Amino acid sequence: MKPKILLTNDDGITSTGLWAAYDALAPIADVTVVAPATQQSAVGRSISIFEPIRANQVTMNGVTAYSVGGKPTDAVIIGLFALRLNPDLVVSGVNIGENLSFESIMTSGTVGAALEAANQGVPSLAFSLQVEDQGDKFDDPSRIIDRYSDAKRVVRETCERVLANGFPGKAHVINVNIPARVRGGYEITRLAEKLFYTGVEERLDPRGRPYYWIDGPLYEDAEEGTDVHAVQRGNVSITPITLDCTAYAAADELKAIFDGMHI
């Protein structure tokens, strides 16, 4: 019997990246698509608690899928607890745009969905495809085509390996980033701290009042061994991520700082 995969994303159910992942996985698994109805990039792991969530069964590309009126995390929760899919694996992506560095995984809806699945006890992988034109991240994801041949191969090979060999015991999410032009092989990496230099652009509205765009150029010189460096070299970056954000190395220092404190 084929393994079961819940497939989701943050670019929305019409995204060509989502359906590229479906095409890659359908031959090796029983895949159910449960994805946001609309674009949900950069929502991180946010969750809908002040409004109801609707999940509509739809047919796309000849496939029965579920369109969720919410965020990527909502889609995972609906798939696990409302639809009771009981997947062996949750796959999120393929995202249009790289999700590299600690900075990105904290804001990415793609990685957020994978983190939610992992927090619910389901092994998960997030896949993202680097874009050469940053504007592609903000275009209609249903119109981004003809760039998924490498991504499909990576999605299939990576998931086949994980399903055959088991999920790494000390990891909760595997974050995979695919270069726009693959020139090397697979590289096991760690998270860089940042992908972008943070900047703010101030503009004025017609009434002369300021408003702001958060923007900034990409890092060009990433440290060797990081996910950013690997993708810049044309390698596929595979980064193990854990849910435990505890800084154990700081525990003794904190104990010394707060020793003797009483309330």
Curated annotation (Swiss-Prot):
Protein name as annotated: 5'-nucleotidase SurE
EC number: 3.1.3.5
Chain sites annotated for binding a divalent metal cation: D10, D11, S41, N95
UniProt record similarity statement: Belongs to the SurE nucleotidase family.
Keyword 4Fe-4S: no
Entries under SUPFAM superfamilies matching the protein: SurE-like (SSF64167)
Coiled coil: none
Organism of derivation: Methanoculleus marisnigri (strain ATCC 35101 / DSM 1498 / JR1)
Cofactor(s) in the UniProt record: a divalent metal cation
Compartment(s) where it occurs, according to its Swiss-Prot or TrEMBL record: Cytoplasm
CC per GO annotation: cytoplasm
Catalysed reactions, semicolon-separated: a ribonucleoside 5'-phosphate + H2O = a ribonucleoside + phosphate
Gene: surE
GO molecular function: 5'-nucleotidase activity; metal ion binding; nucleotide binding
Co-factor remark: Binds 1 divalent metal cation per subunit.
UniProt function note: Nucleotidase that shows phosphatase activity on nucleoside 5'-monophosphates.
Keywords, in A-Z order: Cytoplasm, Hydrolase, Metal-binding, Nucleotide-binding
Record InterPro entries: SurE, SurE-like_Pase/nucleotidase, SurE-like_sf
Matching NCBIfam families: PRK00346.2-1, surE
HAMAP family linked: SurE
